[in-house]
């Protein structure tokens, strides 16, 4: 049970009782009651986003940050604004794919991997055959090398999305592919790291009887984020700073490598790998998909 496994972390990082620890271990059938979180959500329901970024809750959040020597201020919270961006759309085998744009790398990676793998006509290979697996792995290697080198918050870097998903660019990227051997890492990209599996993040895909489709991916980054629960607020503080490139070329907690494009800067949004995606067929939702880990 994850709550039991992380009990010591909750006790270590919180000076106050939280809903996530008990005197005895959690067992199947136990009910997790989060009263403080319920009050916070009711407040947001009544007052909207202002209830979170200003007023009582903002005071609680900043107080919690100060306890951990954090630097977020009331002014930081008040000045924060969500930003709507146009979805990334591209065609693939008579389907229209709608996915997430920068500052998530997910949509670009999906487009790159689908287009590069199509150069080898995967349909002629049996599912999970060595040939099919090699094509997919090599497409992923090239895409993630581009992620490390080119991708970040488009408010801070040049947005090279259209170049990265163009037919001409991807054919050039695929030119050194061979079934005879794995492409040497030095030929795949400049910034390479070992892969690492993760179990964090939540995704939901919904389609209703009217044909409305929603794909939502949400995360705290690590398991339970920073494991710090805001006293009086009942919610976790995330540890999304790790999604920035703290040191170019060095992998983060998930093994993802970043470069200068994703370095830490004030007011910058970190690069993620979220890939909530809707596939359209003849203009109507056909598949709604997404996954933890991007």
Located regions from the model:
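Active-site-proximal alpha-helical segments within enzyme catalytic domains
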Residues: 35-43, 115-116, 207-216
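Noncatalytic scaffold domains of N-terminal-nucleophile
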Residues: 1-54, 58-101, 105, 165-166, ...
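Internal maturation/activation junctions in enzymes
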Residues: 119-220, 233, 248-249, 256-257
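Active-site rim segments in enzyme catalytic domains, especially the processed small/beta chain
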Residues: 71-73, 213-283, 287
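N-terminal accessory/precursor segments of enzymes
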Residues: 1, 101-121, 266-294
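Short, small/polar residue-rich loop motifs at catalytic or cofactor-binding pockets
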Residues: 84, 198-201, 223, 272-274
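Glycine-rich phosphate/pyrophosphate-binding beta-alpha loops
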Residues: 98-107, 201, 205, 216-228, ...
């Amino acid at each position: 049970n994850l709550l039991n496994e992380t009990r010591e972390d909750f006790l270590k990082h919180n000076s106050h009782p939280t809903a996530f620890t008990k005197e005895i271990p959690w067992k199947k059938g136990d009910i997790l009651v989060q009263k403080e979180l319920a009050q916070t959500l009711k407040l947001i329901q009544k007052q909207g986003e202002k209830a979170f970024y200003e007023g009582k809750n903002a005071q609680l959040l900043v107080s919690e940050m100060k306890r951990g020597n954090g630097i977020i201020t009331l002014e930081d919270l008040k000045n924060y604004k969500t930003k709507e961006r146009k979805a990334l759309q591209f065609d693939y085998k008579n389907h229209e794919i709608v996915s997430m744009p920068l500052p998530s790398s997910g949509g670009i990676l999906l487009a790159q991997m689908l287009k590069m793998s199509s150069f080898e006509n995967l349909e002629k290979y049996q599912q999970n055959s060595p040939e099919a697996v090699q094509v997919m792995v090599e497409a992923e290697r090239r895409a993630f090398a581009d992620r490390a080198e080119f991708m970040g918050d488009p408010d801070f870097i040049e947005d090279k999305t259209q170049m990265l998903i163009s037919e001409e660019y991807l054919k050039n990227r695929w030119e050194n592919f061979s079934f005879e051997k794995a492409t040497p890492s030095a030929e795949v990209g400049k910034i390479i790291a070992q892969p690492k599996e993760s179990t964090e993040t939540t995704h939901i895909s919904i389609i209703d009887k009217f044909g409305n489709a929603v794909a939502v991916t949400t995360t705290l980054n690590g398991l339970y984020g920073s494991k710090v629960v805001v006293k009086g607020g009942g919610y976790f503080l995330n540890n999304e700073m790790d999604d920035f490139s703290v040191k170019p070329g060095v992998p983060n907690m998930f093994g993802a490598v970043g470069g200068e494009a994703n370095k830490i800067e004030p007011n910058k949004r970190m690069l993620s790998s979220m890939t909530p995606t809707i596939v359209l067929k003849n203009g109507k939702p056909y598949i709604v998909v997404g996954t933890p880990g991007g």
